[in-house]
Amino acid sequence: MILSDKDIIDYVTSKRIIIKPFNKDFVGPCSYDVTLGDEFIIYDDEVYDLSKELNYKRIKIKNSILVCPLNYNLTEEKINYFKEKYNVDYVVEGGVLGTTNEYIELPNDISAQYQGRSSLGRVFLTSHQTAGWIDAGFKGKITLEIVAFDKPVILYKNQRIGQLIFSKLLSPADVGYSERKTSKYAYQKSVMPSLIHLDNHKKD
């Protein structure tokens, strides 16, 4: 069962679902809009070796970031051109990880799905690749996987970036996500890189 606008407000008011900050204007008919934070991660590795910890750098914007498509062949000259013409804080190429401003806590009988906004999809920008599912019992901010597929796109801090759809489980989970010892992304307070190297890889 998907929660309606009335259900979402009721769950938040009764603190069964925590959304901080919460804006009643962001409640849709059966979703809640979330906004883009100011911290991002860019990977430094030539190859993603998923058995090892990945190298990355964190960046923080004051206002905006320009995301160029994959294999855009970005040069220093082009970066300086974009910064001067469009007054952006950073220019990046390829995938970049972002985060929501919103911190959420879900009870063990509510799961959620993150979906990018249709308006961003219409300029061929995605804000999640495969990680749209949020397990019951999750606590933390949502890490976003941002990729532009056509032209460079300027994103602004605090703009609406996507929405959460909440579903009620038939019965509560015995162990919620943030209670599991194997959960790698519980209580994340900002953007987090992939921690897949912590998985138990079976070697033949």
Curated annotation (Swiss-Prot):
Catalytic-site annotation from UniProt: 145 (proton donor/acceptor)
Annotated site, Important for bifunctional activity, chain positions: 132-133
Chain positions recorded as dCTP binding sites: 117-122, 128, 132, 135, 143-145, 163, 177, 184, 188
Listed pathway(s): Pyrimidine metabolism; dUMP biosynthesis; dUMP from dCTP: step 1/1
Pfam families on file: DCD
EC number(s) given by UniProt: 3.5.4.30
Key words, A-Z: Hydrolase, Magnesium, Nucleotide metabolism, Nucleotide-binding
BP term (GO), one: dUMP biosynthetic process
Necessary cofactors: Mg(2+)
GO MF terms, alphabetically ordered: dCTP deaminase (dUMP-forming) activity; dCTP deaminase activity; nucleotide binding
Known catalytic reactions: dCTP + 2 H2O = dUMP + NH4(+) + diphosphate
Known function: Bifunctional enzyme that catalyzes both the deamination of dCTP to dUTP and the hydrolysis of dUTP to dUMP without releasing the toxic dUTP intermediate. It also acts as a dUTP diphosphatase with a lower affinity for dUTP than for dCTP.
Assembly and interaction partners: Homotrimer. Two trimers assemble into a hexamer by stacking on top of each other.
Name the record gives this protein: dCTP deaminase, dUMP-forming
Species of the source: Methanocaldococcus jannaschii (strain ATCC 43067 / DSM 2661 / JAL-1 / JCM 10045 / NBRC 100440)
